[in-house]
Amino acid sequence: MDWSAFNLSLKLSLWTLLLLMPLGVLLGRWLAMTDFTGRSLVQALLALPLVLPPTVLGYYLLATFSQTSSTGAWYQSLTGKSLAFSFEGLLIASMIFNLPFAIQPLKRAFEQIGRDVLDAAACCGLNRWQQFFSIELPLIWPGLLGAAVLVFAHTLGEFGVVLMVGGNIPEETRTIAISIYDSVPVSYTHLTLPTIYSV
């Protein structure tokens, strides 16, 4: 087993989880509790990673992160590193790819909170932050846990986006999914050659 690839996948999953969950909570709450013009359009845009094939999404992200793009050139001028084929680029791509898996369970969890509960809390003198931490956060806990499991598991098994954005650089962008993909032809050869020779 390629332990360096496994450790990199674990690192990517944990960082994606830590950075994406607060963003998922904010966006999920905003979509569930705010009625605004263009809400359906925003939801459709946030769901795009579910619709686009991973390799297609990865290609567009790679084009965005490349040194010839304004985003990639800005990042390189700021850090001196290329965003494409780097762990940082892989992390950003993973967050974008997993955004719907974080938002949807949390949005549904916020929608299940009764408006009367929040109105009662406001009547008791609780401000927005107090309502969020003492009432909303405990009530959305099942949705939060579900979103965390989905994001972590989905990141751990990512292949298409990882391959397009990160490539296959050992100890930098080579995840366990890429390592398994690389080992399949070798394993297949080991299995088929004895069969051919026996025939």
Regions found by a protein language model. Name each.
Residues M1-L18, M33-F36, Y75-G80, D182-Y188:
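Periplasmic/extracellular loop-to-transmembrane helix junction in inner-membrane transport proteins
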Residues L52-G58:
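Transmembrane alpha-helices and adjacent helix-loop boundaries
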Residues G58-M95, V165-P170:
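Membrane-interfacial helix termini and adjacent extracytoplasmic/periplasmic loops
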Residues L18, F101-L106, F110, G114, ...:
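Transmembrane alpha-helices
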Residues T189-T195:
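Conserved small/polar residues in nucleotide/adenosyl-binding loops
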Residues L62-A63, Q67, V161-Y188:
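Glycine-rich helix-loop "coupling/hinge" segments at transmembrane-helix boundaries
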Residues W15-L46, Y59-L61, K107-V117, R128-F132, ...:
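Transmembrane-helix boundary motif in ABC transporter permease subunits
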